[in-house]
A protein has these predicted regions:
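N-terminal helix-cap/turn-to-beta initiation motif at the start of protein domains
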Residues: 29-45
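C-terminal motif of bacterial Sec signal peptides marking the signal peptidase cleavage site
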Residues: 17-20
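Bacterial N-terminal signal peptides that target proteins for export
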Residues: 1-9
Length: 178
């Protein structure tokens, strides 16, 4: 390896490391109100409206979701029925489990492994890999998902999608509890 290449590689790795250190953690929202309790908010029927924007910001798809959610102890089932702007429908059923340390783990049929999340203040942050079908192929895409409770009925959600560290787009949702 040449010295120039080594220097460039070191600079790139250093820049990536510094960028990773600047990430916001959920604890930054510890004092924000109203305090979010997933078991309280995700209980009953919730309506949501959302959109997917590609990395250029253009809205590529819009959707409505009706979620039926219920908890038994520390285990919650969130049954989501999607209606997309092209008339297609889909369904995702999440199973969430509150852990002894207060964190959450979640599974769904199209989630690879487990989603892992934490709550602090009015915020819920979780990460997971989703198997997304696109044009007959399935891609494993990373989700960095943030939810913020605005009041007892409204929650806002933004998820950044990436593959191999490359930003693919964002999903934005507004939840309204009935």
């Amino acid at each position: 390896m040449t010295r120039l290449f080594k220097a460039l590689l070191f600079s790139l790795l250093l820049a990536l490391g510094v960028a990773g250190c600047g990430s916001v953690t959920v604890s930054a929202y510890q004092d924000q109100k109203p305090a979010l309790d997933l078991r309280t908010y995700f209980n009953g029927t919730i309506d949501a409206w959302g959109m997917f924007q590609g990395r250029d910001g253009e809205v590529a798809r819009r959707f409505k979701v009706v979620m039926d959610a219920k908890w038994t102890g520390d285990t919650g089932v969130l049954d989501e029925a999607f209606e997309w702007n092209d008339g297609t429908t889909s369904r995702r059923v999440w199973t969430l489990k509150r852990q002894p340390d207060g964190s959450y783990r979640g599974t769904a049929d199209d989630v690879v492994g487990e989603a892992i999340g934490e709550v602090a203040g009015n915020a819920f942050h979780w990460r997971y890999v989703m198997a997304l079908p696109v044009d007959g192929k399935v891609y494993h895409v990373d989700f960095d998902d943030w939810m913020f409770l605005m009041d007892d009925r409204v929650m806002l959600n933004r998820a950044a999608m990436s593959k191999w560290g490359v930003h693919l787009g964002d999903i934005t949702l507004s939840f309204t509890k009935r």
